[in-house]
Structures are given as C-alpha cells and as structure tokens.
Amino acid sequence: MNREVSERIHILFFPFMAQGHMIPILDMAKLFSRRGAKSTLLTTPINAKIFEKPIEAFKNQNPDLEIGIKIFNFPCVELGLPEGCENADFINSYQKSDSGDLFLKFLFSTKYMKQQLESFIETTKPSALVADMFFPWATESAEKLGVPRLVFHGTSFFSLCCSYNMRIHKPHKKVATSSTPFVIPGLPGDIVITEDQANVAKEETPMGKFMKEVRESETNSFGVLVNSFYELESAYADFYRSFVAKRAWHIGPLSLSNRELGEKARRGKKANIDEQECLKWLDSKTPGSVVYLSFGSGTNFTNDQLLEIAFGLEGSGQSFIWVVRKNENQGDNEEWLPEGFKERTTGKGLIIPGWAPQVLILDHKAIGGFVTHCGWNSAIEGIAAGLPMVTWPMGAEQFYNEKLLTKVLRIGVNVGATELVKKGKLISRAQVEKAVREVIGGEKAEERRLWAKKLGEMAKAAVEEGGSSYNDVNKFMEELNGRK
C-alpha cells in the first residue's frame, strides 16, 4: 500500500497489565509499525520496564520506524492495592486467600487511567485506539473524542463463537449436572463440553456484571482485532463476522512479527536461562525428540501435581524442557522433585524456573511436541511452530481452545483434564506419561505431526505479503485512512 499515506496513521495500543495480554499487544504494535504506522504503547511505570528493552532493540534494528511508550500513573496503594501491584502476575504469585478478590479490585482500579487516556487522546489525536477487552470504559473515552476503539480479546475466533453461543442458547441450563456433556448449539461442528469446562461467569456476580460491560462496550466499538489467521478457523471466523461482531480483522499469528533470534529471546520477561545455553542443549538432541512443557504465566501447580508431572515425564522416556512456575509460598528449593530425578534425567531433561524464551524453543527442530495449558498465546505459538500438542486446560477460555486443537484441527492429545484446575483434581503420572508418549510416538503421531507442520506453513504464509493476515492488516489500515 502507499507508504506515504500509511505514515499518517497513529495507533495507540493499551494492553491489560498481565504478561499474556502485554506480549501479543507489543507484537501487534511492532507489526503495525513495520507496516508504516506510528505505534504508541500505553502502560504503567512497572510494566513500561518490561516493554523498554524489546522496544529499544526493535528501534535499533529499524531506525526509520516509529514506536514508543506513554506511561500512565497508577498509584497502587492509593487505589487500595498492595505496593507494586501493577500487573496481574503479581496477584498470581501473591497467592493469599483473597487473591480472587484482589484480582477484581485490580480489574476495577484500571479505570483510574480513564482521565489520563482521554487527555492523551486529546493531545495526540490518534487514528485509532486498540484497547484490551478488560478496559470496557475505553470505548466511551474514544467515542467521546471521535477516535475508533478496537477491542483485543487475545483469543481465537473459535472460543469467541463458543462463548457467544453459550450465552445465547444457555445449553448448560438444560443438563442435570455441571459435569454433564452437551453440544454447544448453533456452531459449525459438534462441539461437546460441560458447564465446568465452559467456565460461564454467573451473571449476578461482580465478574459476571463486569463481563456484561465488556460485551456492551464491544458492541459499541469500531471492531475487533483477532490474533489468528483465516485458514486456521475459517468457519468460525465467518460465523463470528456474521453473528457476533460484524467488523473483525484477523492479523495473526502475532508471534511471527518477531523475526530475529534476539527478538524471540527477549519476548516477555527476562528468561531464567541463557538463550545460547538453551539452543546448545537443543542442538544436541535428535529432531522431533524433545517435549516442551509450559503452562503460562498464570498457572501455579501444587507440589503434588509437580511431582506427578515429574514421574510422568520420567516414565515416558522422552527428553524434555519443563518450565516450572511456583508461587512465593513454595520457595525456590526443588523438594517436590522425586528423589534422584535430576541425576536420572541428566542430559535428558532441562528444568527452567519461572520464564523461558518460548518462541525460540518452539521453533527449534529438536522439539517434537508441546504440553500446554491452551492459553491462546501458547496455542497459536505452537500452531505457528508447526507442533502437535498435549492439551491441559486450566481455566478461562482454555477448554474451548482445547476443543479447537483436539476436535477441529486434530493436532492435540488431551491429557485428561475435565474441570478447572482450581477445583484441585490431580492429573496422574500415568495420564502425563500416556499423553507425552502418544504425541511423540503414538499410533496417530505421524499423521498429527504432518498436519501440524502444514498448519505451521499456512500460518507463516498468512503473514507474508499477499497472505490472509497481511491483507487484513492492509484492509484495516486503509479503513483508518479513509476516515481522515
């Protein structure tokens, strides 16, 4: 498209303050910057530190492109939050008995930034505001100042369609128990789920009322940006545009906007392993022989569950890289590991505490499977890397994403999770071992691997010039230009 015209576009990107929301929004800001727009990320002081290094590196590599940060004040203590509570990951590691209440308080406190947002919009007069779904108040701010507001959910078309049809048809009200399976009505394909898995927010709860606000603000917004590509879930992209949100652009996989090795390594928090050391370890392994396990930035397993995973991995006989997050009450020691586990798996297993350079690892030829919690960032990163997956959903919309991976795309093997992780049901070592064996070398492993590889190729083609996501970015930018 015309480079001079596109340079006039200035887009504000306002992510919810949590790693899983910030990472794809940073990718998106870089993507639009590469396509000639000026990108400005809006965030708070502590979160700005997470953005600074990757943005600085991006600017050094692309000196002609425009991308920056605007910091909003967020006085935690004044807002009734603990000191330093500027990110939802703080709450996940906080792990006090009232952490659920703290999350809600954090969610509602973000409205404190509304006035700062409006002042900044008035001053800069941007072409558009891309704001996270968790900022429903942003629609009103943007509308008041004549700026189109785009919603970013950070999930798949498929899960958005599932959520919509669950709300419209309420099939969970027509079954005997919360664990009774039913088909979600009105969707392409027979998608079977239970109320426990669908994780429907009760409408009368504070979270239920908040989600109603989210939906209303979405209805009044300019449209929706989705981190997916058309070929992956075309039937659901079409359904979404026909029945849910008339205006939606697919612009993913966003993780593919990280092209350089350093960009992939620096994505998110500072990794707890040197990337060169990690790559050297992977280089020593046979292609497709290593299983990678990571459960997102919001999952903390109990010591009992960590022990079962360890036994399951050892029993599978597979080489592995395992990213382990624990909350502050569990300490840094590894007493949860089976006795002698480290010695028995020396050279075969790598345990990374906290944060790992995930995209860098997934892209390595030694990786043959990905054990994931089915958060959409991880799922789409696994798809873009062309990998089959072991699905272990924990909460949020993750059971929907699992259905997409296992039933629609057929590149996933279910570990056996049937309800939200907070209910405390353990996945046994036998289940872990069976799923890991199946994804790497089971009866249908080759067929699954070939199809996953094909999807990975389609993902990469989607973001190249002429691809479906590349073209949708064009359409979106042309629409913004047309408003001038």
UniProtKB/Swiss-Prot annotation:
Broad enzyme group: transferase
Residues given in the record as an anthocyanidin binding sites: H21, N92, A396
Phenotypic consequence of gene deletion: Decreased resistance to avirulent strains of P.syringae.
Keywords per UniProt: Glycosyltransferase, Plant defense, Transferase
Catalytic activity line of the entry: a flavonol + UDP-alpha-D-glucose = a flavonol 3-O-beta-D-glucoside + UDP + H(+)
Summary of the tissues where the protein is detected: Expressed in roots and senescent leaves.
Keyword RNA-binding: no
Protein function: Possesses quercetin 3-O-glucosyltransferase activity in vitro. Involved in stress or defense responses.
Family according to the record: Belongs to the UDP-glycosyltransferase family.
Name recorded for this polypeptide: UDP-glycosyltransferase 73B5
Record gene name: UGT73B5
